[in-house]
């Protein structure tokens, strides 16, 4: 019984890790929310937070601002989580 449970857990873990590495297409709001969740955590995207960023949050965007090609990378073709993380 314990051996069956252990094998089942190992198979489930490997299936979940493969699903995360799978390339997917992200566009528009879904792309921006996914990137924000990966870079700054799941609680970083809030609708009621207001339009203005705090001074520290605005400064943290300085390195990301100049990068181009995210929409091409993940909307025109599928991208992986690792590719999304490279834009953080």
From Swiss-Prot:
Where it mainly occurs, coarsely classed, is: secreted
Which compartment or compartments is the protein found in? Secreted
Name the tissues where it is expressed. Answer: DAGWWLTRGAARSLGGVR-amide: Expressed in corpora cardiaca (CC), corpora allata (CA), antennal lobe (AL) and gnathal ganglion (GNG) (at protein level). Expression in CC and CA detected in most animals, in AL and GNG in few animals (at protein level).
User: Which residues are processed away as propeptide to yield the mature protein?
Assistant: 20-45, 69-88
Q: Which CDD domains match?
A: IlGF_insulin_bombyxin_like (cd04366)
Check the record and name the InterPro entries matching this protein. Answer: Insulin-like, Insulin-like_sf, Insulin_CS, Insulin_family
What are the entry keywords? Amidation, Cleavage on pair of basic residues, Neuropeptide, Pyrrolidone carboxylic acid, Secreted, Signal
Sites where Arginine amide occurs are at 65
Quote the cellular component terms of the Gene Ontology held in the record.
extracellular region
Give yes or no: UniProt keyword Cytoplasm.
Answer: no
GO MF entries: hormone activity
Signal peptide stretch: 1-19
ATP-binding recorded as keyword: no
> Its Gene Ontology biological processes?
neuropeptide signaling pathway
* Pfam families registered for this protein in UniProt: Insulin
The family note in this entry says: Belongs to the insulin family.
Name recorded for this polypeptide: Insulin-related peptide 4
Which species does this protein come from? Agrotis ipsilon (Black cutworm moth)
